[in-house]
Amino acid sequence: MPILAECTEPLAEGVIDMRGLWQGISGRSGFLERIEQCGNRVVVTGHNLIHDFRLDGTLRNGARDVGPACENFNSAILFKDEVMTFRLFNLFDTVSRRIDGENMIFTFVDGVETRAKRICKYPKE
């Protein structure tokens, strides 16, 4: 069951609809993630983690992740020029997602781009 299944708030102004299940078709092998959006809240599930954050560019409402060695990562996330960008400790860009036609381009901090296709969307009702 999606985390934001009960949310009916429209997407925030200027936010591109990335909702759905995305599967990599080039770039990093095994890429698969689900993106949920409601208002300015986003939940990304994949890669053995769940990001739950607001698109307000603050660390307070950003993604807080814990790595395998218990290291903490805190990212501010913003949506600008149709690109969702994760900024580690709000110091530098680490990950971005953008729509390119029918695909999503996921770019990691090392510059590797993964092109993903949306294999399903959430039903309207």
Kindly give the residue locations of the regions a language model identified.
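Short aromatic-centered micro-motifs
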Residues: V44, F53, T107
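Contiguous, well-ordered beta-strand patches that form the walls/edges
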Residues: G27-R28, H47-D100
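Generic detector of short, aliphatic-rich beta-strand segments that form the cores of beta-sheets
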Residues: R115-K117
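Amphipathic/hydrophobic helical signal segments and adjacent flexible N-terminal regions
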Residues: M1-V44, N48, R60-N61, D65, ...
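Short, exposed beta-strand-loop hairpins at the edges of beta-sheets
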Residues: N103-G111
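A short, structured loop/turn motif at beta-sheet edges
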Residues: Q37-N40, L78-V83, R98-N103, K121-K124
